[in-house]
């Protein structure tokens, strides 16, 4: 995985002024999942569509904005 993944989720979240805890509470995605995506332990490109939808809705971005390789 590349650093791009971290940039997408973490940077978008930080630019919105939302903490990981807040994002978890607002989106319904587990805090540990968010942490693992941002730390590149889990590949966000392999996340369930529902998870990506929840994150994108709260962050006000497209699902593609969160993906490392949106063209795949």
Residue ranges and their predicted role:
Residues 29-45:
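Recognition helix of helix-turn-helix/homeodomain-like DNA-binding domains
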Residues 1-15:
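A short, Lys/Arg-rich alpha-helix, primarily the initiator
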Residues 9, 23-24, 34-37, 66:
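Conserved hydrophobic/aromatic packing and binding residues within compact polymer-binding modules
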Residues 49-65:
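DNA major-groove recognition helix of helix-turn-helix/homeodomain DNA-binding modules
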Residues 14, 25, 57:
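Alpha-helical residues within the helix-turn-helix
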Residues 65-72:
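Short amphipathic recognition helices of helix-turn-helix/homeodomain-type DNA-binding modules
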Residues 19, 30-33, 48, 62:
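Short coil turns linking two alpha-helices in DNA-binding domains
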């Amino acid at each position: 995985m590349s650093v791009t993944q971290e940039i997408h989720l973490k940077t978008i979240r930080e630019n919105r002024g939302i903490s990981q805890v807040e994002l978890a509470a607002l989106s319904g995605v587990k805090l540990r999942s968010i942490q693992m995506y941002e730390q590149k332990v889990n590949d966000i490109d392999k996340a369930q569509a529902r998870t990506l939808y929840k994150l994108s809705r709260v962050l006000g971005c497209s699902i593609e904005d969160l993906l490392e390789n949106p063209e795949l």
